[in-house]
Structures are given as C-alpha cells and as structure tokens.
C-alpha cells in the first residue's frame, strides 16, 4: 500500500491518494466525517478551525461505496485564506522558516509554511479514517488519546478499551481522565492569556493486531521502522516510543511468556506488541511526544533575514496547542501503518480473498511435537 499526500495549506484542496487498497471493501464515510470533526473541534484550537468545514469528497477508487482496487483519492477543500499578505522575512524559532530558507533560498518565508503547516494532516486523518473500514474487517481497532498537556498528566486511565474510548470522547482535550481534563483546560487558558503555547504527550493503541505482521529481514519493513517514519513526519512530533518508557532493567521490562489453556500469553506488554520488527500478538501501543507550537502570541527574539538586524517574531494565526488534534492524527497514522503491513502480509485482490487468507493462516504453528499448539 502507498499513501501520497499533496496540497498547500491555503491552496484549493488537501489531497490523499491510497494505492493498493483491495477491491470489494465497503467504505464507512461516517468514520471519516467523525475523525475529521474530532481533529477540527477540540479545546485549544485557533481561529482557522472555525473557518474550515473539512467536507471531504472521494473522487476515485470507490464505486457505490465499494472500493474497486484502483487508487482511492480523497479531496478536502480548504476554506480559510492566507492571513499573511506581505513578504515575511523574520523566522520563528521551532518552525521550518529558517532551515528551509537556507536550503531553498526563496525570499518569502510564507512559501515554506504551505507544505510544512499541520494543515496537511487533515489528509492523513481522512486516509487513516478510511482505512479503519479495512481494519474493522480483521477485528483490529485503533484508539488515540492525550496523556499529558503542559504540566498536567493523566493518572486514572481506564484499562477497559470501550470505557477508555467513552471517557476520551467525553473530554474536550481527548484525555480519558476527567480530573486531568479540567487541569489541561486550565493550562490552555493560562497559556493563551500569557501568549504561550503547550506541548504534551499522546498514546495510541492498536488492539487485535495478530502476531507475525511486519518483517525482521528488511530493515525498512520492520513495523517499528514504519511507525517511526510516518509518526516523525507529523508536524510537532519530536519523540516516538513504542511500548513503555521505563526500560532500565530487563527483569522489569521484558515481557515473560506463560501458558494459559494451552496458549502462549505474555505477563506484561512493555515492548508495545512488537519484537524485532514483527508483531507478537499483544496490543501495539505507542507514546508520542508533541512539542509546543512555534507561533507564540508573545513575540520571541529573531533576526530579519532581509536586513540582518535583530527582530521580533510575527504572530501568524495559530493554535495554543497541537496536542489534542495530534491524538487524532496519530491514531490515523497508526491505522495507516498497520493497514500497510497487513496488506503486505496478505497480498492483493478482493477483500474476501484477503479475509480467507487471514482466517486460514496457521502462523506460527509446529507439528514436530515440540509445541502442542500455538495460535496467534
């Protein structure tokens, strides 16, 4: 499977093209609408999100709601115009401005923002949401939520997956801990008043992923390699940890095996469901660190690249924090990565053929008497 994303932040459309989607898959457009709404409507968003409607259109690869096997193209119109009309020459610390100017040497810093703006993640969100229709056929579910925003960290996160989803959806910042949600909202209000911005942390879980997805032979097809590649492409993401961050002692960290009713289980899942680039049958889970947005309400010190004189950074329409919407985007990103690895594993064709291959697999299972039986 291949995902291509194009479009400028203030151009006519953001575009996602998915190649390699099997034929015969029924697409649930309501999932796409819901995920685009969640990305757009969360606490801490700026003025632009009130202008956008994100009314997507699927213009190829789907006929009568069913995929044809051809590339699937999703268009998301941009409604908001560019608020900056003049040439901008003062770079913002933490943004693409200066580094892109040094490399590409175009004099207007506005040019670089069109591609590096997080607006393109609306296309990633749409693509990931569409792929949830595929994952649902294999009983795989993906869920993302906020675990930290500024100095506030979630402490009471439900273990039950459906309760986790319900509490996440009840939160204005997509945090499943109600007490932490209140604190995060206060953090956002305080940062907005001070002209500051906030970073934080997001967790994404993929439940139901079978063992044996990914690769150990091809370094770039390792599932953790693919996760890192796509997640680090998301603006503001500065760190990705698969599984637990507490990895100091082997006795505490390594997931020991045990037998339960003749099946191999793990006592813990600190490794995040991946060993050596291949899924091991446990939930795949990822911690993502999101930096503060570089456009602050209070100006920062910079340099005017035209005059080479000290200058203050301009304010360009922006959010207070990217953390809540990043939880939606990262959820979509994990859906893309898991779908890609799953299709690579199962091959091409009609969705019913893929489901038969999936159901008939006996990996790994031995009949030499060493193991009685092992199921994914």
From Swiss-Prot:
One of its GO terms (biological process) is amino acid biosynthetic process. NADP(+) binds at residues 39, 45. It is an enzyme of class 4 (lyase). GO terms for molecular function: chorismate synthase activity; FMN binding. Keywords: Amino-acid biosynthesis, Aromatic amino acid biosynthesis, FAD, Flavoprotein, FMN, Lyase, NADP. Disulfide bonds: none annotated. Pfam families: Chorismate_synt (PF01264). Signal peptide: none annotated. Its cofactor is FMNH2. Its EC number is 4.2.3.5. It catalyses: 5-O-(1-carboxyvinyl)-3-phosphoshikimate = chorismate + phosphate. It comes from the Bacteria. The keyword NADP applies. SUPFAM superfamilies: Chorismate synthase, AroC. GO terms for cellular component: cytosol. Pathway: Metabolic intermediate biosynthesis; chorismate biosynthesis; chorismate from D-erythrose 4-phosphate and phosphoenolpyruvate: step 7/7. FMN binds at residues 115-117, 276, 291-295, 317. Reduced FMN (FMNH(2)). NCBIfam families: aroC, PRK05382.1. This reaction introduces a second double bond into the aromatic ring system. Belongs to the chorismate synthase family. This is Chorismate synthase. It comes from Thermotoga sp. (strain RQ2). The lineage of its organism: Bacteria, Thermotogati, Thermotogota, Thermotogae, Thermotogales.
